[in-house]
Amino acid sequence: MKVTCSAPGKVLIAGGYIVLDPQYSGLVIGLTAKGYASTTTLDDKCGTVRVKSPQFINAEWLYNIDWTVSPIRVHQIYENCELEKNPNPFVQLALFYVINYFFSTGRQPLCWQDLQVTLQVDNAYYHQPQLKPDQTSYPKFNFLNCTLGQVHKTGLGSSAAMITSLIGSLFLSLRRLTDDTGDKSLKIDDSTKVIVHNLAQIAHCSAQGKVGSGFDVGAATWGSCIYRRFDPKLIEQLLVPYDEQIKNINFSTELRKIVSKKWSDVVPFQLPATYCLLMGDVAGGSSTPGMVKKVQQWQKENPEESKNCFDDLYSRVLSIKNCFLSSESLDSELQSQFRSIRRILQRITVEAKVDIEPLKQTNILDNIEQLPGVIGVGVPGAGGFDAQFCLAINHTEIIENVIKTWKDDGVVPMDVSPAFDGLAVE
C-alpha cells in the first residue's frame, strides 16, 4: 500500500522577525510549490525504513529500528562503504518521532511492516540550471545533478514542506498498521493535522538545533494562515540530537501527551481574489539563523528602540490583515502599510548591521513598487537574498509589467501562486 502526502511552501509577507515572539503574529501565504512524500508498506518485517530522494546524487538512506531501548532508536545503516557518508537529520528525526509516537519500547510490534519512502519537491524550491537547447521546460521533479548539501535554495521552505509531508505520509501509514478498529481511511482531519504539525515542529527544530518561529511548518500544515508562534518551552525537553541515543523510559508517553494538544491559534486565511502574489528568484541565498542572531543581539542592546520597531511592525501586520478581511477596496491603505513595513525593515537593516533588505534588493523593489497596480513588495521572512514577493492587483497587464521589469533587473519569475490548503493526501 502506498500513501502520498503533499505540503505547500510558504512566504511570510508581513511579520518578519516579530513572528519569533508569541505576543505577535505574522501573515503567511501558502504556495503551490509543494513537497511530496510517498510511503509504501512492504511485506518484509526486518525493522528497516529505506528513504530516497531521486532529484539528488547520493540521496538514499537506510535506517534500522532498535525497539529494545527507550526511546526507540532509529539509526542509519551504510550499505556501501565506498560512498561518502550522507546523514540526513531531518529524515532521521522525522522517523524517530513518528515511530516513538506510535510504539513503545520492547519487542518489534507484530503489526510492523518495513517501509519505503520517496521524497520529491517541486522545482521552485531550488535554483534550476539553464534549459538545454532541446528543452522547452523542466521535468516536474527535475534531477539537479548535485548532492542535497550542494543545492541552492530559493527560500520557499523546502525543509518544512519535506518534513511535514514526510511525517504526514508516515503517520497515515502507521495509523493504518496499528489501528485494530478496522478504520483504514486516509483522512487528514483537524485533529490529525494538530498531531502531524506538532511532530513536524519538534523534528524540524531538533534537526536545526534550535526552536525557530515555526511559521514554515505552520504553513506546510495549515496552508495560508495568520500564524502565532507556540511557546518554545513546550518542546525543549523533547529535542534530541539525531546521532545520539538519549535515555528516557517515559519519552513516548510524554511525546504523545504534548503533541496531542493544539499549541497556539493558527487562523486560516485566504488572499482575496482581487489580488495576485508573484514571487521572483534573485539567485542569491541567505543564512536565516545567522541573520536572526544579529537581530536578536541588536534587540538585547537596544531593548526600548527595538520594541518600538516591533510594535510598529505588528500594527502594520494587523492593518494589512484587516484590509484583506474587509469587503471594501482598500488598495491605497494596503500600499501605505507595505511601504511602512519596508521602511522599518530598512531601518533595522542599518541599525542591526544585517542584510534584511540589501541594497541590491532595494533598487529592484523600488522599481517594482512604483509600477501601476502594485500593492506591496518586499523580501519575505527574514529577508536577505533568497527571493522577492510582489502583491499586485490581479490583472493580466499589471502582472506582465511586473514580470518584464523583474526580467530586466535579472530576477527570474517563479512558477508559484497562493495555496489556501495545507497538508493533503494526493
Swiss-Prot record:
SUPFAM superfamilies (alphabetical): Ribosomal protein S5 domain 2-like
Annotated binding of ATP, by residue: V151, H152, K153, T154, G155, L156, G157, S158, S159, A160, A161
Listed InterPro entries: Erg8 (IPR016005), GHMP_kinase_C_sf (IPR036554), Phosphomevalonate_kinase (IPR035102), Ribosomal_Su5_D2-typ_SF (IPR020568), Ribsml_uS5_D2-typ_fold_subgr (IPR014721)
Associated pathway: Isoprenoid biosynthesis; isopentenyl diphosphate biosynthesis via mevalonate pathway; isopentenyl diphosphate from (R)-mevalonate: step 2/3
Annotated localization: Cytoplasm; Mitochondrion; Nucleus
Classification via PANTHER family: PHOSPHOMEVALONATE KINASE (PTHR31814:SF2), PTHR31814
Assigned protein family: Belongs to the GHMP kinase family. Mevalonate kinase subfamily.
Record's protein name: Phosphomevalonate kinase
Species the sequence originates in: Schizosaccharomyces pombe (strain 972 / ATCC 24843) (Fission yeast)
Gene behind this protein: erg8
